[in-house]
Structures are given as C-alpha cells and as structure tokens.
Amino acid sequence: MKKHFLLACLLMAMGGVYPDVVNAQCGDNGDGTFSNPVFWADVPDPDVIRVGDDFYMVSTTMHLVPGAPIMHSKDLVNWEIVSYLYDRLDDKPNYDLKEGTVYGRGQWATSLRYHNGTYYAYFSPNDTPYKGYVYTTSDPKKGWTLSSRIPHFHDASLFFDDDGKAYIFYGTGQLRELKPDLSDVMPGGVDMKIFERDKEENALLEGSRVIKHDGKYYLLMISWPRGGKRRQVCYRADKITGPYEKKVILEDAFAGFPYVAQGTIVDDGKGNWYGVIFQDRNGVGRVLTVMPCRWVDGWPMLGDENGHVPATMSKPVQGYSSEGLVVSDDFSGEKLKLNWQWNHNPMNECWSLNARKGYLRLTTGRVVDNLFVAPNTLTQRMEGPKCSGVVCMDLSGMKDGDVAGLSAFNGDAGILAVTCQGSQKYLTMKTESVKLDEKNKSVTGIDRNEIQKVELTSDVIYLRLDGDFRLNKDIASFYYSYDNKDWKKIGTDFKMIFDYRRFFMGTKFALFNYATKSLGGFVDIDFFNYQHIKK
C-alpha cells in the first residue's frame, strides 16, 4: 500500500491532483516574496528571538503533547519545528485524561529568551497548582531541561537587563524581579504595578512581550478598547519601573478576518525590524503574520506606511525554504515526526512504529465511550486556504466495540469513524459537541449526531478529510475509498469552529482508535498523506 502513498506524493509534486497543491511553507511564494499569513494554521502567542543569524520562535499548544513547539528559521518566513519544551506534563491526572481533562489549559503563552549562552523559556498553565515552568538549554535543537518551578505569572515575558538582573512582566502591567538564575522570585526585589489602565481599556491587557532598544524599555501587549477591536499597544519608559506612556502601534483588520494583535518584534541584526503577530481566523485557529516594524519618534510602528498588514512583501532574508508546518508521513522512521502531537499525555505502551514496520500501530489502552477522553489521539494542524489529509488504515486487528478513524477535532468535532460490531465493520460520518465542567474540564455531556453509516467490505480503508478555511467557510468534508482513487463522499459538510471556552485552539487532523468494550484491539496506519491547497 506504500505505493499509493508514493504515487499520491508524486502527483502532488506534479500538481496532478490539485493544481494549486504546494509542498513549500505556505507563506513563501518562491520568488523572493512571501504572503501573509506566513502560517495559515494555528500558531498563537508567538515569542521570537534572534541569536546570531538564527531566529527561534515558541507558540502555544495547550493540551497537546509534546508541548510548546520550538521553531527555527533563517528568514522569519520558513520555519521548522526543532524541539519541544517537554514530552508530558504531570501536575495532575487530568493530563492523562483521568479525573477530568485539561482542554484549553496546559501550556499557555510562553516567553523565550537568550542570555549569556543559555536559552530560557517560561510558561504557566492557567490551572492548578498555578506554578510556572522554567526550561533551559544551550541548544534549542537538542532538547530542554526543566530547571525550576516558580510562581504563576499570566501571559508573562522574561527580561534580562544590562546589569544582569532578571525580571518578569505579566498580567496587566505587573513587574516582578527574579533571581538571576530564574530559580525563584528575588526576596525583597521589585514587585510592583508599573501602570494603570486608561479609561478606554475595558478588559485585560495580555500577551506581554518586552524588549530594550536605544536605552528604553518597550512592553508590547494586546488590548480591547471600549467599543473597538483588538489591537497592539506599546508602553515605553526610560526606567524599567516607569513611568510608562502608551501608544497604539497596530490597529488593522486583514483580509476580511478579525483584527491582528498579540506578538512581538525582532530585528535581523542589520537594522531592520519586523513584527510577528497573530490573527484570529475562526475554525483554523490563530494564524501568524509577519510585517515591517518602523521606528517612528521612538515608537515601533507595525505594518506598512499606512499601518496595514501587507498582503505580500519581500522576504527578510533570501535563499531559504522549508518542508512546512503540516507534513505527510509514511511512518517508516524510528520516531514520529515532530509535526505530530498527542491529545493529552499518551499511553506510550499503546502505540508503536516497530510492531509492524512502515506502519503506526494504535492499540486500545482504555475503555471509554467517546473520543474526547480517548487516549492516544494523534494530531496535526489543519491549514488554509484549503487542505486535504488522507489516511490509510488496516482494520483487521480491531475488536468488537472498537472505534477508529479520522476527525476534524475540536470542541465541536466532525468524525469519520469505523466501528467494529462483532465480525462486521461500519463507517459512520457523525458530529459530536462536547460539554466540559468549568472546574476540572471533565466531560459532562456530548451532543451526538450520526449523519450517514455504511457497511464496509474491506479491512483496508482510505479516509479523507478536506478543509476549506477561506473567508466565511470553515467547512470540513469527508470521503472514503477502497483504492485511494475512487472517492465517495459520506455525510454532510461540517462547520468547524473556534471556541475559547473549550479547546481554545484551531481544528486539527486527528487519528484515533479506542475501545468501548474490551482492550487489545489495534489498527495499523499505513500513511497520512497531506496536501496544502493555496487557492
């Protein structure tokens, strides 16, 4: 069956299946320019640093693990995931989908810094026990070490001043001094509110990002003015403790979607500055834009000369490309590609790349009654404008009551599920909408809608999920095939959503297999073939 994977990849490269399919990073136009968004995929809460000629970025993935992806770039456009801060979180059993879940919690906005040869990253889950994580490394490509647990600081930004003192900016204008090694807060150190919100702000100021430029301190944040739209603001001061003055540095809708705000600025070492800011785009999640940053009267003004996010501009550095953020996989490697993430901590004994060479085996590890509490659901992002994912599954190892398949996974999920009922297997297109307890995020209810069910005639099945994230679309469509050529649509189109009250992330491709009766059944996944469609 690998031949089907190779053929599909060849057709994709030749443009034979979809004429606008590309392998390259979605923002790179291949002619020295790039188009925004750089990532039309879920890459929220970016923090970016430059060390020499290398850019590093961290983003938020919350309840997915491994978590806190660290990406590397040479040009701010082409990025690749090189590591994660952690393989799992173990503060409480919810991370294992026991006694509740951590949907929409886990790893939130992370701060990334480089100081005296060491890279630092800090984040704090928006959840009990409300303690932050500090990770360090000498090389982001070689993994990270948990070095300390310090107090919870919401949407924080680490900062090392020229005198070696360490600080953390957080919340709505809070400043706290830390020990230089970030092992704890500094006893008797700075602990203050550096400004008060003015009257036009009616909510939290969030997403702190701090830099020092020409002797001044700049704190970038997102704000929501009364009766207005989200925007990027900047507070600046001559002293770290203030007084601070404020200016709006970006207030712009882009391409018909909501306003662009929350991120940071970074220079290229040659005097040029850029903003790296995200934008909400509904079902696909929060997408990444890159734009000029112009210093005007000592303020970092974002966007073009008119303050707008440019649709297309020259790449900051020429000559680089990348595989992309979402990738195909024939599961022939010794490890999963870094593009994959599990939903919550995986049961590592229940998945394998070695049980059957060239296949990913997912073995049932816990008896559950729904996808939202099923362990070992494997995900990748979906991308706009359009994308398509095909998975080939060998179902012969399934047991009675097992459920396996492919999902457009979110709080509202579109699901293409194979169910094993005795000796017969059925394919169902259905939707499920989860209800979560506010305290521990346990599943309190699921609204289910079975749309179409067909009896399968083969133990080898190809499942396809197409996503359309163009303006006012957010549509998922489902198909199946016995030969990867003759495709039959099943069910109806499914509307993908973004809901901060539940998952707080964009919709994901999700591969799954879980038991509803007894353990030990398995499916073998031959490949996942991904196509990104630019038009």
Which residues does each predicted region cover?
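Bacterial Sec-dependent N-terminal signal peptides
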Residues: 1-25
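Carbohydrate-active catalytic/glycan-binding domains of CAZyme proteins
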Residues: 21-535
